[in-house]
Amino acid sequence: MNVINRFTCSHGQLEKSILRLKSRRMSPIIDYIKESYHVNNAMEIKEKMYLYPNNHFALKLSALGIREKEEQCVAQVEKIIECALENECTVLIDAEEHAIQEHIDGITDHMMETYNGMNPCVYKTYQMYKKDAPEKLRYDLFKARNYSLGVKLVRGAYLKKDKSMGVLCTDEEMTHTQYNQAIADFAYQYKKKDKLLCATHNIRSIHVARHYMKLNKLYNVEFAQLMGMSDALSEYLQRSGYKVYKYLPYGSLYESVPYLTRRLYENMYMLKYI
């Protein structure tokens, strides 16, 4: 298996990859790999929701034109979420580089307020390698709201771009600490229908999540790992009775190479502890 087929799949391989995951009793997070804006990107995502209902979908707002046409981006996100609701899908809005993250968070908050109701069909991503991430999560958990919160915890994948902004943790251990504390904060402060997705390959963080799930009798915590990474860990969690997702990036060969290059380059330092 070459590196592209290990970590991504083509349009033609997508259905087979989804079925393969489900045969292993894991679920996909379907992720259209194209990261640059194109007018047809939203249509591509909606088409896949019709083809593969009852699934999770990752959504990168840079691919919908948040840099170029923010108002149009918001309209596209609304249409995608309405399509997701029609097809019983869930939308995980990705975090991206710090320069546009405030806009992404604002749009995500609006979508959760509008569409989540008592069941989160929209998830917000918290990058725990940022110093202010714990405060943002606590604010969202504590604030008065009449909708459920979908929380996706990641460490972060934009190290090169974000490092110069002065927003990152001072060291690796601080990132670990913040991630694990975020799990604890959720365990003690969540509201009834809130859900947590721990997107991590880090064993210690998984132990922390399992500890609080057992201690507080939590049934609203799930796990996710990347396609082609930590497969033994994913299978162990699935066999232990946990809900497990695998990120399933798909696209053309032309689209996959830049994606893989970016993931490798921006995660060289982070990979040892994600």
Positions of PLM-derived features:
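Positively charged, amphipathic and often flexible ligand-engagement surfaces
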Residues: 1-274
